[in-house]
């Protein structure tokens, strides 16, 4: 009788612990689902105060990352964490560094190194998320079997592909003399090309804005092509209805500068200034930052 009672107590305690663990897992899943929901990012992207967002993002990113470590199966959390690293590197580290005066070259180098590190950190999180969903993806990518690696991808995978490629190429753009990284750039280009195939209108034409910058900035021997840059610029403006200002800056700072076309350069910057940041609430932060760059 005592032995039977002991067994029952052990079973009861085991079930209690299991239920507690299950409840904790369910609660964490709900929190993660909420944080990773498509609309959650507008808390940041819809803000009109870049300094406020810039101060808040580091804590937010590390909070997301700590949850991600506890929940390695949650792809939405990985997408948010990886993309936030890349957004932060671009908007709050690289962008201020780009605007530093010549005499602050050492500070600029330091900030560029930080941005590169965070670009790659975000990229790696996103690539691992894709490998988790499609086992063998990273191995095929490393072997340059791009078609085989990307064939299973669907439209739902576009955000992971886009941000991984953006972080990858952002890091290379900051440090084009990193030959080891440069050797891997075709993989990033393959990811972005797959985005173009699956969802050319993604995020208001973000992929076309990317290609405006890519074809406009790259040297000829790496695929630079001003005609293609202008073609993607038109498609980016069409996709966004002219409410997102990044394409104007992308064309101005690459093609217009390289062609020494001052008239076009000034015209494009004036178009940035003419867009009301409130016209597209979901991109208010981006348009506010771009407005500062153009002033």
For each of these PLM feature ranges, what is it?
Residues 33-66, 70-71, 84-197, 206-239, ...:
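Short coil/linker segments at helix-helix boundaries
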Residues 1-8:
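Bacterial N-terminal signal peptides that target proteins for export
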Residues 73, 203, 243-244:
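Short helix-capping/linker turns of helical repeat alpha-solenoids
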Residues 11-15:
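Alpha-helical transmembrane segments
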Residues 22-25:
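Bacterial signal peptide processing site
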Residues 17-20:
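C-terminal motif of bacterial Sec signal peptides marking the signal peptidase cleavage site
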